[in-house]
């Protein structure tokens, strides 16, 4: 009495909101890691709103703001193994990001950087924060930077990237003392 279990697929992405006319990349994971896109069949619930290519890149058509689409990934060798991911188009993209904060920090101290995100009404203004070197300074999803001992005397760059597919980002250099 042998029962075969379906591999559990999960689609991951950096966002669920993408500006109309822009794109985002999705990945499929199983318990054993990331699935090679060539082993998947990607489909869009509405090609008039957004298309998806064989690499998992979803491209929203222009003037689709407010509309949603469900992207499905199916394993080529097991059509019963599939996952879905809902995305919504925003009317306008992010046009600019500026970061404010202190340009120098002492080791073991923290500061919260502020990202001013500009865009017309309806833009998705959430950003992803990253550090150029997590051994020198870390940054949380809220922009909280902590200077680490290994970074003493170094300079680190903190980046705030728009998640809406606009490609907009801002960089902020901090000297660690």
Please annotate each region the language model reported.
Residues 1-177:
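Extracytoplasmic soluble-region selector
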